[in-house]
Structure formats: structure tokens, C-alpha cells
């Protein structure tokens, strides 16, 4: 009798089972890998998309180097800079950084109502407009119109009491000048290195500009802290509708700087306490909680944690960090960190608090920072002085996160 050898083989069924099991295992492995890649791509694309809404992708124009600069408006309406500086070259592309654009574009829509006729300010007379949460300093400038030459003149004179943006306790300020709603063309002052009370005394001319068009514009000044290695930090802004200014002669103004409308104010706040023990030569930093943190992920949330750096004479000494709070824009940390700081080194010490968004598959994102020292911004300096004035007592204070 003839028998099929395959049917008679007792090992055949077991080989089929093994083959099917291997196929299923490989399929599941490929599926897991593909899901992981899709999640990573969605997270990266979400962050890039959000960042593209906040920053301009084109480099800044070269930094100004002359005492008088001009934008000439020919018949075609295209603005060109007609005042190159002899013997000087523009900054390299590597020194140019993008700025938040919503600070300019959002402002166009917010200044169409509640306009009052403006009168020149003086050193003593600048009124404090509204209740500002933080002193950002003030700026002095003048503006006027030459009817014979159809030229608007803007002179940036000086600023006072600017906040420190660098951990060294100072800033490198410069000013951008726009005539809104035109956001494409701008002029800039020089950068004043390490100066919280800079003097510019630079004059800017908008030439070939008919008066009937000038009065339809808004003069917008944005003060920024120049940063060679990252995005320039907004310090504050001033805006004046030119139809509310007597332009027949140069008018000089002192104006308080207001927070820039660039989204930096929506980064959230952090509550922390400082406790100074002079006998133990130590400071205890307690990271308590945060609120209204900026969402950094595509799902509208963040995975925040906090880094604490101890700096001495602008050099990093020691780092501590909290645990990561998953998908939480109002996290509660309640973590304390002790740092050894001799009393004689206290004046040269800075504590940098950085709130980060954790990302497993790419670089972690900075949500915002706080610089604590005796020479930081007004709110930070107050906290630092209160800590020293009340030794061995935890002194808690809310801080606005900054870019």
C-alpha cells in the first residue's frame, strides 16, 4: 500500500506551527516599531508646527552702526536702506537671530481703539499707564515730520532701568523700529553691551513718505536683549499711533516699556521659596509648584521638570533637578535642594531656575527661566533681598517664566 510520506511524517505539523508562530512574532515586532516611529514623528512635527507660529524663519537685518539711518520709499513702495556705513560690514549670518513675530502682528489689531491725543513726556512727568506687574524700564525718543522733504524722523535717545536678561546680571539692549502695519521693513540701533541704562542718540529717517500715509501708521519700538548664541530676548515695547501726535515739530517722549506681545508672558509661573542660613553658609531652594505652563507637545500638554543651576562669577558650580511630571501644566513638585554658598561669595552668586519639557526621543525643550541674584530683574532682586533680610526663614514668591 502507498502512503504519502508528508502525511506520514510526525514532524510536519510541528514545523507548520513553528512557521506560523515566527510570522506572527515578526509582524508584531514590526508593528511595535512602526507605532513608536509614528509617535516620535507626531511629537516632533507638533513642536515644530507650534514653533513656526511663534518665530520668523528669516534672519534679522544687519545691526545698525551709524548715527543716522534712512529708509527711502520710492514710487513703487519698496523700502530700501540708503545709509550704508563706510568702513563697516554687517553682522555675519551666524550672528543674526529670529525674533517673535506675533509681538508685531498682534499689536496691529490691538491698537485700533481707545486712542488719545499724546503729549510729549519729560524726565519727571512720565505717567505710569495702568498697573504694570513688573518694571521693564523706560525709553526716551523723539518723532517729527519734515513736510518739504516728505520725511518722518525718529530719534532713539536712551533707556533707563532695563531689566537684566543675562545670568551675569546685565543685558545687551538694542531697539527695533517699525511703522505698523508694515512688519517687513525695520530699522535697528546699535547693541549696547552690558548696559541697563544705554544711550543711543541715533536718528532714523523714513524718506519719501507722504504725510497722509504717515498718519495712518503706528510707531512701534521694541527693545531686545541681543544674544549671539540663541534667540534675542524681548525686554519691552512702546507703540504710538502717529495720527495722535503733533508731527509739525520734533516731539520728545518718555514712555514706560510694556511686556512684548510675543507669547513670552504665557509661559507660566513658578512658585519657589529661598531659605538662607548664614551660619551654615547654605541656601535651600524649594521648588513648590507651577501654574499655566506653556504646552509644548502636539497634544496640548507638557512633561515638565525643573533644573536648578548654582552659578558663581558666571561659571556653573552645581546642578540639581526635580522629577518629571507627566502631562501636567499645573504641576506640584515640593522638592528642596541645598547649596553651599559662603557669605563672602553671595554677591557673585546667581541661581538659575529652568522649567523644561521632557522628551524621550528628542532634545528637551525650555519652557521658561528665572534668574535669582542681587542684580537680576526687580521681582527677582526683591526675592533675593527678602531672603537675606529674613535668615533661616523660607521666603516664597511667584515668578513669571521668561524666554
Curated annotation (Swiss-Prot):
- In its keyword annotation, does this UniProt entry include Cell membrane? yes
Q: Per the annotation, how and in what number is the cofactor bound?
A: Binds 3 Ca(2+) ions per C2 domain.
Q: Which residues cross the membrane?
A: 17-37
Q: Where does this polypeptide localize?
A: Cell membrane; Presynaptic cell membrane; Cytoplasmic vesicle, Secretory vesicle, Synaptic vesicle membrane; Lysosome membrane
What is known about its processing and modification? Answer: Palmitoylated at its vesicular N-terminus; palmitoylation is required for localization to lysosome and phagocytosis in macrophages.
**For binding Ca(2+) 3, which residues are annotated in this chain's numbering?**
227, 230, 233
The protein's matches in Pfam families, at most eight in alphabetical order, are given as: C2
SUPFAM superfamilies per the UniProt record, alphabetical: C2 domain (Calcium/lipid-binding domain, CaLB)
Protein's membrane topology:
Single-pass membrane protein
Q: Which residues are listed for Ca(2+) 4 binding in this entry?
A: 297, 303, 357, 359, 365
* Entry binding sites for Ca(2+) 2: 166, 225, 227, 233
Question: How is expression of this protein distributed across tissues?
Answer: Expressed in a variety of adult and fetal tissues.
Functional description taken from the UniProt entry? Ca(2+) sensor involved in Ca(2+)-dependent exocytosis of secretory and synaptic vesicles through Ca(2+) and phospholipid binding to the C2 domain. Ca(2+) induces binding of the C2-domains to phospholipid membranes and to assembled SNARE-complexes; both actions contribute to triggering exocytosis. SYT7 binds Ca(2+) with high affinity and slow kinetics compared to other synaptotagmins. Involved in Ca(2+)-triggered lysosomal exocytosis, a major component of the plasma membrane repair.
Know the name of this protein?
Synaptotagmin-7
> What species is given as this protein's source?
Homo sapiens (Human)
The organism's lineage is:
Eukaryota, Metazoa, Chordata, Craniata, Vertebrata
Amino acid at each position: 500500500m502507498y502512503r504519502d510520506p508528508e502525511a506520514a511524517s510526525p514532524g510536519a505539523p510541528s514545523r507548520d506551527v513553528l512557521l506560523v508562530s515566527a510570522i506572527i512574532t515578526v509582524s508584531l515586532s514590526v508593528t511595535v516599531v512602526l507605532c513608536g516611529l509614528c509617535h516620535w514623528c507626531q511629537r516632533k512635527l507638533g513642536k515644530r508646527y507650534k514653533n513656526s507660529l511663534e518665530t520668523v524663519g528669516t534672519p534679522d537685518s544687519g545691526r545698525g552702526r551709524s548715527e543716522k539711518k534712512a529708509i527711502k520709499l520710492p514710487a513703487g513702495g519698496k523700502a530700501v536702506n540708503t545709509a550704508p556705513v563706510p568702513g563697516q560690514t554687517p553682522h555675519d549670518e551666524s550672528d543674526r537671530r529670529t525674533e517673535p513675530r506675533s509681538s508685531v502682528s498682534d499689536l496691529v489689531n490691538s491698537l485700533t481703539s481707545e486712542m488719545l491725543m499724546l503729549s510729549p513726556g519729560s524726565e519727571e512727568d512720565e505717567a505710569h499707564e495702568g498697573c504694570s506687574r513688573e518694571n521693564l524700564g523706560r525709553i526716551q525718543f523723539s518723532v517729527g515730520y519734515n513736510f518739504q522733504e516728505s520725511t518722518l524722523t525718529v530719534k532713539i535717545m536712551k533707556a533707563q532701568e532695563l531689566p537684566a536678561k543675562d545670568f551675569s546680571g546685565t543685558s545687551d539692549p538694542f531697539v527695533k523700529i517699525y511703522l505698523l502695519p508694515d512688519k517687513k521693513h525695520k530699522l535697528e540701533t546699535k547693541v549696547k553691551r552690558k548696559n541697563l541704562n544705554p544711550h543711543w542718540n541715533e536718528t532714523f529717517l523714513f524718506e519719501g513718505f507722504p504725510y497722509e500715509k504717515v498718519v495712518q501708521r503706528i510707531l512701534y519700538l521694541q527693545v531686545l536683549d541681543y544674544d549671539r548664541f540663541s534667540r534675542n530676548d524681548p525686554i519691552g515695547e512702546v507703540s504710538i499711533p502717529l495720527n495722535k501726535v503733533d508731527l509739525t515739530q520734533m516731539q520728545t517722549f518718555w514712555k514706560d516699556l510694556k511686556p512684548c506681545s510675543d507669547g513670552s508672558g504665557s509661559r507660566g509661573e513658578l512658585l519657589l521659596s529661598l531659605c538662607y542660613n548664614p551660619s551654615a553658609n547654605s541656601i535651600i531652594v524649594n521648588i513648590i509648584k507651577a501654574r499655566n505652563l506653556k504646552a509644548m507637545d502636539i497634544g496640548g500638554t507638557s512633561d515638565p521638570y525643573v533644573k536648578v543651576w548654582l552659578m558663581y562669577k558666571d561659571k556653573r558650580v552645581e546642578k540639581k533637578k526635580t522629577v518629571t511630571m507627566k502631562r501636567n501644566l499645573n504641576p506640584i513638585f515640593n522638592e528642596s535642594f541645598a547649596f553651599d554658598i559662603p557669605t563672602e561669595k553671595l554677591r557673585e552668586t546667581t541661581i538659575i531656575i529652568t522649567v523644561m519639557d521632557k522628551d524621550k526621543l528628542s532634545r528637551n525643550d525650555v519652557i521658561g527661566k528665572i534668574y535669582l541674584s542681587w542684580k537680576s530683574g526687580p521681582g527677582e532682586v526683591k526675592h533675593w533681598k527678602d531672603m537675606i533680610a529674613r535668615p533661616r526663614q523660607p521666603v516664597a514668591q511667584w515668578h513669571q517664566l521668561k524666554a
